[in-house]
Amino acid sequence: EKADIVSVKEIAPNSPILSFEVEPEQKIFDDKRVFSGTILNEGVRRADFARVVFYLWDENTNLISSDSAFINGSTIQYSSGIITDCALEPSESASYNVGVAISDTANVKYITKEIHFSIYE
């Protein structure tokens, strides 16, 4: 019965929750921008093949360039035999380093970033 319910607790989803720990460090060169930092898994499940993507935009939000890199995470061997070093366990953090090539005449006005991952057993 509805009247017998004392309380309801929300259960965290059984998934990774990845976030940037701090704003990325950015190094500007003539032909590229290099972003580095760390991400954190605040979820309750491992994130597999985690990578960080950066997008560089001009003043009219036209995409100038983008690139991504896998994180420097934990080494895992999956049941298929594949071995990777870009998994991120719950409560762990990992570093990344992403270089985005641009022309020396590019006028970058906006930068956006995303974290992508997969989930495997």
Residue positions per predicted region:
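Terminal connector regions
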Residues: 1-20, 97-121
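Short beta-strand segments of immunoglobulin-like
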Residues: 22-27
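Short, solvent-exposed loop/turn segments enriched in Ser/Thr/Gly
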Residues: 29-36, 51
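Asparagine-centered strand-capping/turn motif at beta-strand->loop junctions
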Residues: 39-43
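Short acidic/proline- and small/hydrophobic-mixed sequence motifs that coincide with surface turns
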Residues: 46-49, 63-65
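Hydrophobic beta-strand segments
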Residues: 51-54, 69
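Short aromatic-acidic-glycine turn motif
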Residues: 56-67
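Short, solvent-exposed, Trp/other aromatic-anchored flexible loops in extracytoplasmic proteins
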Residues: 65-110, 119-120
